[in-house]
């Protein structure tokens, strides 16, 4: 069976993308987190013959940290290495704001990279990003914004090629079974909200990878640090032809810490 690296090498889709989320630097030993990401994510995407977009779909951090903490140091090292890969491959890096208690306004640590050697988009409000002819709706996790705020992007701005977000999809989290854009907390999305999306919706927030209603995908988190997450961990590779609207998503597993829940 041909590997995804070889599939990228021998085919020529319009876009080749890597999606990762819920990194949560500082949830466990950040040195070990960095080692896993360096060896199994950064080194992997560096081998791809083509790379157009890398998207971090929320929650780089686990909570607010002191600037001199190991979590901040390793997170900055990770982003710096990722930017160097993107610069060499002429890839766009999208960094999406995640849960407020996790990213905690710390994406400012990366503002100084914007306008540098690589094309970097740090997204902290809902907006469209235009990347090499591809239109992407990007939705960070926001609170109490109201239905009209989201509807102007979802329904009143025309068609778009794909959507990347950090957030909640109906049925993906216990107790979140009803779609709701007017929530006092974060909205709960459903496929009906993405009727103008011509491609996949790829999200962070839920730590187990999965697909809902055929076109909504969660990356899952890249490693384990607690019980109850025995499912495979990893990241997504997206091959997306925006002309034919065909796409292929490959889940690339990451070897991680093992936790066994015994009932």
Identify the residue ranges that each predicted region occupies.
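Short amphipathic alpha-helices and their capping/turn segments at secondary-structure boundaries
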Residues: 2-12, 36-50, 149-159
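Accessory, non-catalytic peripheral segments of nucleic-acid enzymes
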Residues: 2-13, 53, 240-263
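Beta-strand-turn-beta hairpins that frame and shape the catalytic cleft
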Residues: 8-18, 128-138, 158-162, 214-216, ...
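Core catalytic region of metal-dependent phosphoesterases/phosphodiesterases
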Residues: 13-16, 23, 27-130, 193-198
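Active-site flanking residues adjacent to catalytic metal/cofactor-binding acidic residues
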Residues: 20-21, 57-59, 97-98, 165, ...
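Active-site environment of divalent metal-dependent phosphoester hydrolases
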Residues: 24-28, 62-65, 95-107, 129-130, ...
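Conserved catalytic scaffold of divalent metal-dependent phosphoesterases
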Residues: 97-192, 222, 239
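Conserved beta-sheet core of the metallophosphoesterase superfamily
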Residues: 175-247
């Amino acid at each position: 069976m041909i590997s995804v690296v070889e599939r990228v090498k021998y085919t020529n889709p319009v876009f080749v993308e890597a999606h990762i989320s819920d990194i949560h630097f500082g949830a466990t030993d950040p040195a070990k987190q960095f080692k896993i990401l360096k060896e199994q994510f950064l080194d992997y995407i560096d081998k791809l013959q083509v790379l157009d977009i890398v998207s971090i779909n929320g929650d780089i951090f686990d909570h607010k940290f002191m600037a001199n903490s190991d979590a901040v140091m390793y997170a900055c090292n990770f982003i710096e290495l990722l930017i160097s890969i993107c610069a060499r491959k002429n890839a766009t890096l999208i960094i999406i704001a995640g849960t407020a208690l996790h990213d905690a306004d710390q994406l400012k640590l990366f503002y100084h990279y914007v306008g540098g050697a690589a094309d970097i988009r740090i997204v902290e409000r809902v907006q469209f990003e235009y990347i090499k002819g591809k239109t992407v709706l990007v939705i960070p996790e926001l609170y109490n914004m109201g239905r009209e705020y989201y509807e102007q992007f979802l329904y009143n701005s025309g068609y778009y090629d794909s959507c990347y977000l950090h957030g909640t999809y109906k049925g993906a989290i216990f107790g979140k079974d009803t779609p709701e854009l007017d929530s006092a907390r974060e909205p709960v999305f459903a496929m009906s909200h993405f009727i103008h999306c011509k491609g996949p919706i790829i999200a962070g927030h839920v730590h187990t990878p999965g697909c809902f209603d055929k076109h909504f995908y969660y990356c899952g988190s890249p490693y384990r640090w607690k019980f109850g997450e025995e499912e495979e961990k990893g990241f997504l590779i997206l091959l997306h032809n925006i002309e034919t609207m065909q796409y292929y998503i490959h889940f690339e597993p990451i070897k991680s810490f093992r936790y066994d829940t015994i009932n």
